[in-house]
Amino acid sequence: MNKLEKLRILLTVNSMKLNDLVDFVKSGDISVEEMIENGLNPATATQIEDHFKKEKQRLLTEEDMISRIRNYQKQPTPFLNWSDLPPLKSGFTDLYFLGQPGSGKSCILASIFYHLNQQGMIIDDVHNLQGTIYRNQLMDEFSYGILPDSTAAEGVNYIPLQLQNDDPQFKGRKHPLNFVEMSGELFDRAYKGGINDNSIAARNYLNNTNRKLLYLILDYHQHEKSRTVAMGTSQSNKLQAVLALLDQYGTLQYTDGIYIVVTKSDLFPYGVNQKEYAKNFVLDNFKGLITNCKNLQEKYRNRFKLIVYPYTIGDVRFQNMLVNINPESPQMVVKDILEHSFMTTNSGIKKLFS
């Protein structure tokens, strides 16, 4: 930058965009002090300084995370088969995460469990000890920036726990939950051959009277990639078919929420409102899925909620290195879990919807 250009910028400093001013400071062409001397608005100067403070903190966090990843020893993941699992606990709300292979189900669970643990909300339930071990491994590895292994082709995991509700209105009450994660291969098998003991319905996991929350996982990156690369049956077609099968199977009569989760939302265009973009993305690209969901809502007289979430676990580098954890996505999910599941009374006997 020559002296004339620098002078021109300093004379018009208050009419320039914040991002441009940050870039000038970052490049070393102009300092914040020089801008202030030439009349820069104090509020804008503070914004520039805050930007660099946050950037410095982010880099320190990334360096710490990368160091922890390098020194972490990955443990084998305890994936189970249907025959290894105990029956679901009755009187709990069942949460099912359904989506094709690689859609991000395990990463979502790791993110949610990490957030719950950070907030001190988890009350252990060892009805399925292997599920508790799996949950703890997800949380521990996530805290080190290690992403979960893909669920084994026949893999299922069932994690029972209770959440402490610290809302002053509900102080002392708990939300008993069964988290159920099934491999994408079992989901595909249900799409191809129906819901049965060889796909996602073994051991009466879907055929029970527990209230249910269903999470339909859409992979944003995979959808965008499919615009130019043939990838077989679309996510939407699979989810629509499995949703119809769940209706036929009788599962939806006990369902209180269907949540369409758009994963990898960190790949959305920069600067967009994530919630609005996710909603419009689904409305524009998954019209059939939305139509089917709304028809089922009408069939069951609006008994269940229909909500679209954007979801990102954070800043992922080199495909599998999590260097910055995003707290906002799990916060949204947990908020609705507390609102749409039921909870015990203080005596722990009668169940109430929250």
Task: Please report, for each region that a protein language model flagged, where it lies by residue.
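Hydrophobic positions on the alpha1 helix immediately C-terminal to the Walker A/P-loop
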Residues: 108
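N-terminal pre-Walker A segment at the start of P-loop NTPase domains
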Residues: 57-86
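P-loop (Walker A) phosphate-binding loop of NTP-binding proteins
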Residues: 100, 111
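Conserved glycine(s) of the Walker
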Residues: 103-104
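Conserved GTP-binding G-domain of TRAFAC-class P-loop NTPases and closely related GTPase folds
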Residues: 201-206, 210-354
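Flexible phosphate/Mg2+-sensing switch loops adjacent to catalytic phosphate-binding sites
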Residues: 114-153
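Switch II of P-loop NTPase G domains
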Residues: 156-162, 169-211, 223-225
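Hydrophobic anchor at the beta1->P-loop junction of P-loop NTPases
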Residues: 95-97
